[in-house]
Amino acid sequence: MNRPKLLWLQSISCNGNAHSFFNHPNFFLIMSHFKLIYHPLLDTDYTLIDLYNNKLDCDILILEGSFKKELIKHDIDIYALIQSYADRAKWIITAGTCATFGGVFKQNEPESISGFCFDIEEKRNNYKKYAHKLISLPGCPIHPKWLSFVLLMLAKDKKIPIDEFHRPQELYGITVHTGCSRSEYFEWKIDTKGFGFKEGCLFYENGCQAPFTRGSCNKILWNDVSSKTIVGTPCFGCTEPDFPKNTLFTTKTNMGIPAKMPLGIPMRAYLTATGIAKSFKIKRLEERVIEYDSKKTN
């Protein structure tokens, strides 16, 4: 059985998505299903110069980093090189928010930097050309198991249902709030007392974007054990087109009400539920989960 040929190319990148994937607990097993043609951080049979001089066969093209026309690396027009292999590849995966929507680097040159097929939410001119083989995996960085899921699905020639931004619905069909260990505090409108606490919700005052950010971070945990909200840090909304926002640790409010509602929830319904929840005082939820200073502890 011929293994699919895999090619990983970078544009303007911090290498974060590559390093995240390297930390997959089954990285070598996953890669054994593919023939790696080139990766900028790994030893491979071909160099970037080889890719430029020889039009090699490519089944799956993984793109990392934001895109800018006429970007030169090692005297090679990287954007032109990427386009040539995008034409040849059977599948294109944009790994990370930068490659998908523009991400952090777009903040530096908003007019000239974008994702490969999307410029924030807008479709670029090349969208129609590549839409039939495009899979978007935004994240800053990408979760390693999201990428392994897509790679193995493609290797087995399985269909991957996608949303309007070509994100796999299996991974992005829910919000980051789904599975959050703080959901009970969210339901009863109990704020956290600060970052790093196990108790309280981070949505109301501390900028958590999990209720309107698509992703499975609280279902498929990082390192199999944790997530931002579990450790007491707000979700930054890194899988969405408009990441990064200007305020990451503060919730924008209008008259004390979060300016942005949870995904699909009308404001009237939210205000009604909030009014009911705040009329009750749940003693258990006002207490510490673990009393570290208690005399009962050993």
Task: List the predicted regions and their residue ranges.
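Cofactor-cradling patches in redox/metallo enzymes
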Residues: L56-D87, I93, T97, G103-K106
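Short active-site-adjacent helix-start/loop capping segments
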Residues: N15-G16, T44-T47, K69-I72, F101-G103
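Catalytic metal-binding/acid-base residues of hydrolase active sites
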Residues: C98-A99, I142
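Short acidic, glycine/serine/threonine-rich loops at helix termini
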Residues: A18-S20, H74, G103-E109, S148-V150
